[in-house]
């Protein structure tokens, strides 16, 4: 009888990855990053444990969307007060807080429970090419080389 091995928390090795979002499509980048955060790229993947790695996303202000989504895609938030709904287009949010677009896309692809919140803490998103995590020596993660050449 084969037994399924569950990795102990001490045996999980976490790496740091650097993703350049310049000229990447939002959804395609988000699925790959969510998979790495979750740990699905490792043979020790366990659905109920945090086996994933840290991911640093840079150049969030240069991410793109296909079609006319820049003008049509809406981001909504609510203050909790009556009449407190705020609606903003992709382009307006891109100008104001481009990090939030990437964070929201990736967060929606993580589990919607305590594990997902723990995984989301390992995501670091920055507007420009600089980030304060150079001491961790992140490895460059190639997502889709064909998309970046367009």
UniProtKB/Swiss-Prot annotation:
InterPro entries in UniProt: Ribosomal_uL13, Ribosomal_uL13_bac-type, Ribosomal_uL13_CS, Ribosomal_uL13_sf
Gene Ontology biological-process entries: negative regulation of translation; translation
Biased composition (Polar residues): 136-150
Record's keyword terms, sorted: Ribonucleoprotein, Ribosomal protein
Region feature Disordered, mapped onto this chain: 129-150
GO molecular function, one term: mRNA binding
Keyword field contains Transport: no
Pfam families listed in its UniProt record: Ribosomal_L13
Family per similarity comment: Belongs to the universal ribosomal protein uL13 family.
PANTHER family: LARGE RIBOSOMAL SUBUNIT PROTEIN UL13M (PTHR11545:SF2), RIBOSOMAL PROTEIN L13 (PTHR11545)
Subunit structure: Part of the 50S ribosomal subunit.
Alphabetical list of HAMAP family matching this protein: Ribosomal_uL13 (MF_01366)
Identification of the protein by name: Large ribosomal subunit protein uL13
Organism of origin: Prochlorococcus marinus (strain MIT 9313)
Gene (UniProt): rplM
């Amino acid at each position: 009888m084969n037994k399924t091995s569950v990795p102990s928390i001490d045996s999980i090795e976490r790496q740091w990855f650097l993703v350049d979002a310049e000229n990447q499509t939002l959804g395609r980048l988000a699925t790959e990053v969510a998979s790495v955060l979750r740990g699905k790229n490792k043979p020790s993947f366990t659905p109920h444990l945090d086996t994933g790695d840290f991911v640093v996303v840079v150049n969030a202000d240069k991410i793109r969307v296909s079609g006319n989504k820049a003008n049509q895609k809406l981001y909504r938030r609510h203050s909790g007060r009556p009449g407190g709904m705020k609606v903003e287009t992709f382009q307006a949010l891109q100008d104001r807080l481009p990090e939030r677009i990437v964070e929201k896309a990736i967060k929606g692809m993580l589990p919607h429970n305590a594990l997902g919140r723990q995984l989301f803490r390992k995501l670091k998103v920055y507007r420009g090419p600089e980030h304060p995590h150079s001491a961790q020596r992140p490895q460059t993660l190639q997502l889709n080389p064909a998309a970046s050449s367009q």
